[in-house]
Design a protein with these regions (language model features):
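Bacterial N-terminal signal peptides that target proteins for export
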Residues: 1-10
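Predominantly soluble domains enriched in secretory-pathway, periplasmic, or organellar proteins
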Residues: 4, 14, 20-326
Length: 326
């Protein structure tokens, strides 16, 4: 009996270790807008290991603070879906208002913001109670969302109004509006919250704002040899933590611009898939992943060499992306 107990215990321990290693395995998740699916990528092999059926026209996508769940904007289903990342199943919905497109998580880990494109609203949701706690009027076609690292401020970009709306996260009031170039898409606070980067798709620029004055302090423009200016359409933005690099997805230019944040000069244009849209880092920021909508794939960029190491085929029109490492 003792031998059987020891063998059984060892087998159970091995099974537990295997399950733990699978759940802790770094994975990337990609929403496929045209297929209504979520692609799951093994970050060790760079292969798609599973594809989940989810709501209609999935776009914005974030992970929970503990990375146990994902929140997906199922835009045409008018809901935010909750995915259990261990079981890869839909475990619930959050109220979102109509046509949620993008989504952001407050640093407190319990508050979600989503942009309602058709209604010109920002919806604020409490995760523990699954309740909408505020809806804030913003400009026409809100899209880009960003929350400051200290949690005091968040911004919304409105594509048609061409504005950045500054929202106090305590009062849920729109405290300022800043004009920006045509069709602002994405926004990103610097690590010290002193500056905000905003991409303008049709304007072809990225604008830097001083977060205290809400005024423009710099505008970046891009020029890619052999690419018409109207094809250079900045969308996704990411800033590295321990490096002077910012990465900007340039849409149908099929390039990612590498910007030196000290000089504001473009150091390189990296060729990726067609219509590059959103960006995500792995845990140590050694890799940058891009969603390429028209080519239906993900490019994996080495952030040291600034070269594409791998291209991964996913579903039709990949849109949102996030990487889980816990």
């Amino acid at each position: 009996m003792r031998t059987q107990f020891v063998v059984t215990s060892i087998w159970l321990l091995g099974l537990w270790a295997t399950s733990m290693s699978v759940s802790a395995m770094p994975q990337a998740y990609v929403t496929n807008e045209k297929d209504n699916t979520l692609s799951i990528i093994d970050m060790n092999t760079f292969e798609v290991t599973d594809t989940l059926d989810i709501g209609e026209r999935p776009r914005g996508f974030i992970l929970s603070a503990d990375q146990a769940h994902a929140y997906i904007c199922a835009s045409d289903s008018d809901r935010i879906q909750i995915i259990d990342l261990d079981t890869h199943t839909i475990v619930g919905d959050l109220p979102s208002g109509e046509d949620p497109e993008t989504i952001a998580l407050h640093p407190n880990g319990t508050t979600i913001y989503t942009a309602n494109e058709d209604d010109a609203l920002l919806t604020v949701i409490d995760i523990p109670t699954s309740q909408v706690i505020a809806q804030i009027d913003v400009g026409v076609e809100p899209e880009g969302l960003a929350v400051s690292h200290d949690g005091r401020m968040m911004v919304v970009t409105s594509e048609t109004t061409n504005m950045v709306h500054w929202i106090d996260t305590n009062t849920h009031e729109n405290i300022a509006n800043s004009l920006v170039d045509a069709r602002p898409r994405d926004a990103h606070f610097t690590a010290d919250d002193k500056y905000l980067w905003v991409s303008s798709e049709i304007g072809g620029t990225v604008t830097l704002f001083d977060t205290q004055t809400k005024q423009k302090v710099h505008t970046l423009s891009f020029a890619v040899k052999g690419v018409y200016r109207d094809k250079i359409q900045p969308v996704g933005i990411l800033l590295m933590k321990n490096s002077p690099y910012a990465f900007v997805a340039l849409g149908p230019a099929n390039r990612v611009a590498v910007v030196n944040t000290n000089t504001f000069e473009v150091e390189k244009y990296i060729v990726v898939g067609r219509r590059v849209w959103q960006l995500a880092f792995n845990q140590d920021q050694s890799l940058l992943l891009t969603t390429n909508g028209v080519s239906g794939d993900v490019s994996v960029i080495n952030t040291e060499t600034l070269d594409v190491e791998k291209t991964i085929k996913v579903g039709r029109y990949p849109w949102g992306i996030a990487v889980k490492w816990k």
